[in-house]
Amino acid sequence: MNIYEINVSNEYRKIVDHIKKGLQDIFSRSHASEGDIYVVNHFPAATDGFGETELLIFINIPDKRGNYYLHLEKNKRYYLNSLVIGIKMLYDNSVTDADDTTLYSTEGYLDYKEELGNEEFYLQKFSSCCNNSLRNCAYFYWIVTSGCKKSFTNDYILFNTSLDISKILYYACHRTRFKQGINCFGKVDDLGAMVRYYIDEANNRTEIGILTKNRIDKITEKGVKTPLRVLANQGKAITILRGKAGCGKTLMLTRVFNAVIASGHHCRFLTFNHLLVFDLKHCLCRIPAFRNTNAYIHTLHYFFYHFSKKMGVLSLFSEKRLNELMGVCVQRIDIANEYIQSFKEETDQWPNNEQFWERYKDEIDSGDSTEITKYIKYLENNIYSLDSLAELREAYIQKRKELLLNELGNEVFIADYNNVLENTYLMLDNPREFYEKYNIKDRRGFLNVMSRTDKKRDDGTMPEYQYEEFDEDIKNTVMHTKWWSKSVLIDEAQDCNNYEKLILMKVYGAENIVVTSGGKDQLIRTSLVTDWTHALEKPIPADFPPLTGRCYRQKENIVKFVNSFGEHYSITSPIKSANESYGLGRVIIDTRNSIRGFSGETLNQIREEGKVQGCSDYENCLVLLPTTGYSSKTKEKGIVIDELDNVDIVEKSTNRKLEISNQDLKIWNGIVERKSGLSVPASNQTRFIYYESCRGLEAWNVLCVDLDSFFYNMRSSKEAELYARTNQEIFSNEEDLKSEFALHWVYMAITRPIDTLYIKLGNPSNEFSQKLIEIGKDSGAIILNEPQVYPMVDELPF
């Protein structure tokens, strides 16, 4: 058996020699005389997780007569053909105990089986782009801690013991066996070539461009006062980092993230944008201190979905919730009918939607307006009279009920998000009320959700689930769900709703939370800024470390354009560029109608200029697309229920295909519906995403395709209507408020680039485009127009 090593550092020399000797002894006693083993040290963090794999072992035994390794288990024989073993090392003195599934720490609990399962999934996902993808693999933790004297080995971890490769090999075979064989990858003639391909692909994916290097330098910079201040403040008061778009809020939050990890603690980073999760992982996985066992980055929806699921709340929704929603719906319809009949009596005609709201907008609560608008539009599409109004009312109610019956059970979390959060908070804040409200004592199925099992009585019946047990289970589940996190960092926290805020404060304590807030100017999800200085109307201690107020992302010439845009539309106050960027940067506005979207020549030229600066493809260009015109998709109906119990029908894309191709590009397609299925972008990929996903991202060059179409799409959206209704005052105009909503989105898009902002206008003659061109001219932007075509002399009419 040939055993090779790759990339072994001095730090791991003794460990690798120990493993090689152990493997040689094992296979010398077997019938496997031919085969190859590769022990790779420091396999790069090329997957979706954090941190390198300290040891990755590939084993291949050719299928030859008399050449085999036999794994015996319960009198059954399994023949080892190919095996991949990953070993992650964890030195953490905060670990105080461990059992068959969980590591226990002063900062929470960790389900290590789940984490190792994630590592295996990440490596298999990565291998799909290699020349021989993995069917299976087995990851292990080798854990050393002074916080616990216990020592043991099981199928997944070696806890405070020596690194016994014979046990690891046995458990790896046990976990990957299938039928009579152990086959983690397909037949290979040259295992070395396969392993080197894996390493080369991993190196290509993790290659660091100049922007990522600079970003890492900024994140890990020593002596920055704010992260030190936040660390000193942990456990005393919530920290709130406030500032405008581009002033460095997310950068400072990642500096805090790094400071917490570097201090030896565990930390969680939450954001609304799935693509920002990818962006942060792309950068932070290059910092050695960040590992899957101490750093976690997720979307808020991911966190709350898993939290509410583990707490058992999702299992409790039933007909009761349906009746509650329908009760609210009927009440709102009856309010509408009273006003409709009153309007008919006064004017002798039935009101349309515009007439109705012009007459009664001051008399109807804004929370009722969404459902009432749907009802009136439904009536408009039907010829109705006093006789048929009651019949149409019943038909509308039945239609809404059928919608809920079909969707509520399958998509309770997404469809009824706010009510799920409300009940999750009730469970945390008042477990006794929750216990009685849902009659938990008789809900035996709830025990399985809460990870509990109880023995039956002698007569075969189950005992009641006592409140004391329930209360204890809540505490244990919260500790498991914290995933070993001392601190939680929340980006763009002005957009959180009240229950998101309250749950996070309950789980982590406000004093262990750090948030960024951009104020009203940067609201996207909601129309009201969340106040993190109060909980249930009670003030909580808060600290406000100052930010510089300067824009470290954009160069001066882009800042000029952005400030002119903001000043013209009065949507935000000006920002200042960093001193070193004075006179640099450019804005290009392309008005050429002959080019749809953008030309490949334009993109390639911009890319080449970025490459000269040392940018990787990931850093170089970020292409922003409107949701129409550049993708094909199939749709199905779904529902969403907001915090006011309004039930809305939405179209969900089940599949999206990017209808842009460029042979010179490796495209990372970020327009898919389920972004959780994507991998972290590689360094050699160019990102194509929707405008709606760009918050918090940056690139050397940003290409805004059909920016005018995006503006008009957002202005006519349901979100814009809600924003207008919520913010409407006596002298405000609804259309102006819709435009304000859309302009905030445009502002977010044009603050993403560092060096070049390229804007392609789909229709240069519309009002928005004309104004953008005017702003561009006044601020020194480059305007690309159609070339003038002059007639020949003999074609002149004189």
What are these regions (language model features)?
Residues 1-53, 57-211:
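Intrinsically disordered, low-complexity Ser/Thr/Pro/Gly-rich regulatory segments
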Residues 53, 81-83, 237, 486-487, ...:
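The start of beta-strands in P-loop NTPase/AAA+ ATPase cores
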Residues 54-73, 190-315, 748-751:
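P-loop NTPase Walker
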Residues 64-76, 354-356, 370-371, 723-728:
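Intrinsically disordered, low-complexity domain-flanking/linker segments in eukaryotic proteins
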